[in-house]
Amino acid sequence: MTPEERELIVGLFGRLQQFENQPRDREVEALLAGLIARQPAAPFLLTQTVLVQSV
């Protein structure tokens, strides 16, 4: 990982942090948790996708 890639990832999660306390749909959270349990690479792939689309 390059320093630039690290900065992009940390920046993305910093932007997401502002929404951390907003209400979330429990059913959606449960579905996502189950899907991530079956596909553990999903957070990596989703992060990569978001960063590619935002550049």
Where are these regions (language model features)?
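N-terminal leader-region detector that preferentially activates on the first domain or presequence
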Residues: 1-55
